[in-house]
């Protein structure tokens, strides 16, 4: 090998190493949210980068939930703390357990204790998708709520109990009866919009609409539903993200996606 060729390779190697180091430093300096999802191998949801396209790094870890049943929640619940520790080791500055039913199914006190345990295990602030719903409702001073869910009757009832324990009156709760999205398939936007609106319209004394389940794609439906129902809409993924980024010291404020996100 000629000396000029050797110098070229050394320079190139140093450039690659320098770029890698710079990328590592940038990642360390960027506020990072670690998210725990019920399914295995779940990617960072597109809602995250739609709402917050820059200035935040998102990490995802799944716990392998296969069905939305209490028995299945029990099976995977023990995987939450190891997942949180893994995300902390990857540089997360805050942890969010991004499963609504996985975090509300045993009630408000159990959900609170989960956050305590995640923080104790990682040394990081933590929240849950269920907390995102509660904080979203509080942001618009909601007291009486209509609730549309993806779940079967049992899990939907458990959400009703959780919300009541959190200080809200549940005027109506109805679910789509889904136990497994793998078996059922996705819910179309039109189906979800019409179902959610019908739940609210059947509970005229409600002052907010809740749509619960992170697998339901609600982000682009919030504004149409708020116009149709003339009431604030709080839903799992968008408002969990809003609550989660606030743990990073950010406002969470985003225009164009409904009342709560506009408040920041």
Go through each PLM region and give its residues:
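Periplasmic-binding protein-like
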Residues: 36, 93-98, 146-147, 206-213
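N-terminal secretory signal peptides and thylakoid transit peptides that target proteins
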Residues: 1-16
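Short, flexible loop segments at boundaries between secondary-structure elements
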Residues: 180-181, 233-251
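Glycine/small-residue-rich loop that forms an oxyanion/phosphate-binding "nest" at active or ligand-binding sites
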Residues: 103-125
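Hydrophobic alpha-helical
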Residues: 196-225, 235, 240-241
């Amino acid at each position: 090998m000629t000396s000029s060729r050797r110098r070229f390779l050394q320079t190139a190697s140093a450039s690659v190493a320098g770029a890698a180091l710079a990328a590592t430093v940038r990642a360390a300096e960027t506020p990072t949210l670690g998210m725990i999802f019920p399914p295995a191998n779940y990617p960072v949801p597109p809602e995250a980068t739609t709402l917050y396209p820059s200035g935040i790094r998102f990490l995802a870890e799944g716990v392998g939930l296969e069905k939305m049943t209490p028995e299945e929640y029990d099976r995977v619940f023990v995987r939450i703390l190891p997942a949180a520790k893994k995300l902390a080791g990857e540089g997360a500055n805050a942890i969010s357990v991004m499963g609504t039913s996985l975090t509300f199914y045993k009630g408000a006190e159990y959900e609170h204790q989960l956050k305590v345990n995640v923080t104790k295990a990682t040394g990081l602030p933590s929240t849950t998708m269920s907390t995102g719903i509660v904080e979203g409702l509080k942001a618009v001073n909601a007291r009486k709520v209509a609730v549309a869910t993806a779940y079967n009757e049992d899990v939907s009832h458990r959400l009703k109990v959780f919300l009541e324990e959190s200080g809200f009156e549940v005027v109506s709760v109805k679910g789509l009866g889904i136990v497994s999205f793998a078996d059922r398939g996705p819910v179309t936007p039109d189906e979800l919009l019409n179902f959610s609106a019908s739940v609210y319209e059947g509970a005229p004394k409600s002052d907010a609409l809740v749509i619960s389940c992170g697998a339901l794609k609600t982000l682009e439906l919030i504004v149409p539903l708020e116009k149709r129902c003339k009431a604030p809409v709080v839903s799992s993924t968008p408002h969990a993200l809003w609550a989660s980024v606030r743990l990073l010291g950010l406002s969470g404020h985003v225009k164009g996606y409904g009342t709560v996100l506009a408040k920041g």
